[in-house]
Amino acid sequence: MQWPTLWAFSGLLCLCPSQALGQERGACPDVKVVGLGAQDKVVVIQSCPGFPGPPGPKGEPGSPAGRGERGFQGSPGKMGPAGSKGEPGTMGPPGVKGEKGDTGAAPSLGEKELGDTLCQRGPRSCKDLLTRGIFLTGWYTIHLPDCRPLTVLCDMDVDGGGWTVFQRRVDGSIDFFRDWDSYKRGFGNLGTEFWLGNDYLHLLTANGNQELRVDLQDFQGKGSYAKYSSFQVSEEQEKYKLTLGQFLEGTAGDSLTKHNNMSFTTHDQDNDANSMNCAALFHGAWWYHNCHQSNLNGRYLSGSHESYADGINWGTGQGHHYSYKVAEMKIRAS
C-alpha cells in the first residue's frame, strides 16, 4: 500500500460531518497505525459514527423460558361485598345428650297468684297475727274471707292481746255525726279516731265466734271495761242488726245488752223502736232501741255535761251526763 493513497483516504474520512451524533465542531478522528509485519502497516482511522440505519425485521420469538421461582406472598386485598345468603343446609344428626343441669329457681308469682297466696296463707285477724309472733300494738294488714286486704289496728296489750279495734274515740278530732253511707264504708284517721265500717264488721263477724270488749277511760285517767261472749253484725239488707252474746265481766257494767237484736240507725235512716229518730235526738249513730243505754258514737264532750245522753255515754258506768275521754270497741276470735 502506498502512503499517498493512505493520506488521500484519510482526507476523505475527514470530510464527515463534524456535527454527526453530537460531535463537537473541529473534532478529528483518532488515527492508529497497526504494524502487521516488516513491510506492511495498516492505518486504522476511527471516524465519526454514521446515521442509524433503518430498523431490521422483527426476529422470531424465542423459546419460552422456564418457570421462575414463586415470589413472596402479597398483602391481603380489601374484603369484597357480602354474598347473598345461601340455602339452609340439611339438619345434622342429634348431638350427644348433655348432663342434667342444676335445679332452677322457683318461678315468680304474678300479681293475682301472689294475692291468692297471701289470702290463703296470710293472717285473717289480729288474733291470727298474735299466734304468728306479732306482739306489738299497731296497724297491720289482714285478709277478709273474700280475700280483700284490710288494714286494722291490733291491740296486742290488753287482756292477752289479739284484739281488732273497730271503734276509737280519743280527742274529738273526728265528727261521728254522719250518715248511713259513711258508717257503711267507714271513716276517720288511722292515728286518732275512726269507725272501721259496718260492711267490714259484718265480714269480720260472719264466720266463727267473736268476743267483744269495750274499754273506757274518763278524764281523770281511770279505766273501766265490759266484756261479752260474742258479737255479730248482719249484712246491710238486715240493717246491720246486732246479735250480742252474754255479758261476761267488766268494771263498767253492762250497757249494751239492751241494744241486742236492734238495727243500726243514723240521722238519715231511722231503724230504732222510738217514734222519733234516736240518732238525730242524741247526736250519734248506734243500735238504738228506745232510745239508748249506751251511745259511744255521740258527741265528744269534756266529762260531765248538762245535756242529756248526747255524749260518749255508758249508762252503767258514769251515767248519761258524763262523756268519756277514751272509748274503744274491739273483737277477738274465740
UniProtKB/Swiss-Prot annotation:
The record marks Y308 as: Mediates specificity for sialic acids. InterPro entries: Collagen, Fibrinogen-like_C, Fibrinogen_a/b/g_C_1, Fibrinogen_a/b/g_C_dom, Fibrinogen_C-term_domain, Fibrinogen_CS. It is a peripheral membrane protein. A carbohydrate binds at N290, C291, H292. GO terms for biological process: cell surface pattern recognition receptor signaling pathway; complement activation, lectin pathway; G protein-coupled receptor signaling pathway; innate immune response; positive regulation of interleukin-8 production. Ca(2+) binds at D270, D272. Transmembrane segments: none annotated. Residues 325-334 are annotated as: P domain. Highly expressed in liver and spleen. Keywords: Calcium, Cell membrane, Collagen, Disulfide bond, Glycoprotein, Immunity, Innate immunity, Lectin, Membrane, Metal-binding, Repeat, Secreted, Signal. One of its GO terms (molecular function) is carbohydrate binding. GO terms for cellular component: collagen trimer; extracellular region; plasma membrane. It comes from the Eukaryota. Pfam families: Collagen, Fibrinogen_C. Residues 163-251 are annotated as: B domain. Residues 123-162 are annotated as: A domain. Its main location: secreted. Disulfide bonds join C119-C147, C126-C154, C278-C291. Belongs to the ficolin lectin family. The fibrinogen C-terminal domain mediates calcium-dependent binding to carbohydrates and tethering to the cell surface in monocytes and granulocytes. The domain undergoes a conformational switch at pH under 6.2, and looses its carbohydrate-binding ability. Extracellular lectin functioning as a pattern-recognition receptor in innate immunity. Binds the sugar moieties of pathogen-associated molecular patterns (PAMPs) displayed on microbes and activates the lectin pathway of the complement system. May also activate monocytes through a G protein-coupled receptor, FFAR2, inducing the secretion of interleukin-8/IL-8. Binds preferentially to 9-O-acetylated 2-6-linked sialic acid derivatives and to various glycans containing sialic acid engaged in a 2-3 linkage. This is Ficolin-1. It comes from Mus musculus (Mouse).
